[in-house]
Amino acid sequence: MSCLPALDKFLQNYHQAYLTSLGELLRYYPQGEASVCIQGEFHADLDQAVSWQPVKREVEGSFANVEHALELTLWPEINHFYGQYFSAPLLFDSEWGTGELLQVWNEDDFTCLQQNLIGHLMMKKKLKQPPTWFIGLLDEGDKMLTINNSDGSVWIELPGEIPTQQLSPSLAEFIGALSPRIAPPVKHEELPMPALEHPGIFASFKRMWQNLFGKR
């Protein structure tokens, strides 16, 4: 079962939750990065939050280059989850705690995602662990949310370790169990690692990647 209907619904609920509770659009700090998601004026030189909303991509994002580089077939849900929309990260509440679902802000962000996904999968191979790919963070970034690439199930994963706690048998069911979390926009800190400087998707991976690199 594709996760796309569940993702569509969550995005609709997410947008509506902010309109209903705050009477305004979603807000996000793009840190100088343009995006079709931005509503209203955008000035790259101004350090301020912008109004935004998710935008369906005209051309679906593809991970064929990642599969080719790693000689690995990825679970097809990766295309539905990351390749359908441009969006800021999505905050959520759940029975497992608070967290965020990662999304891509623009094409540069998508390229950054692919590069870091390759790095993650190469690390899994180096550690002789089954391949996984990340979809988000739990508990303020202390834990990764990952997909088991062999069957599409959702797990909690600590950097450098094999996932031990399954949350859902599918990404569709997992997304369906989440509730939008309303919170003010937070400006992400600059990261010292060049590969992670892009402010869209990987600012949220600060602790995760520091821990991961520390285990090499």
From Swiss-Prot:
Domain of life from the UniProt record: Bacteria
HAMAP family assigned: Syd
Record-level GO cellular component terms: cytoplasmic side of plasma membrane
Membrane disposition: Peripheral membrane protein
Gene: syd
Role according to the record: Interacts with the SecY protein in vivo. May bind preferentially to an uncomplexed state of SecY, thus functioning either as a chelating agent for excess SecY in the cell or as a regulatory factor that negatively controls the translocase function.
InterPro entries in UniProt: Syd, Syd_sf
Pfam families: Syd (PF07348)
Keywords: Cell inner membrane, Cell membrane, Membrane
Sequence similarity: Belongs to the Syd family.
Full protein name: Protein Syd
S-S bonds: none
Primary localization: membrane
Keyword Ubl conjugation: no
Subcellular location field: Cell inner membrane
Record flagged with keyword Chloroplast: no
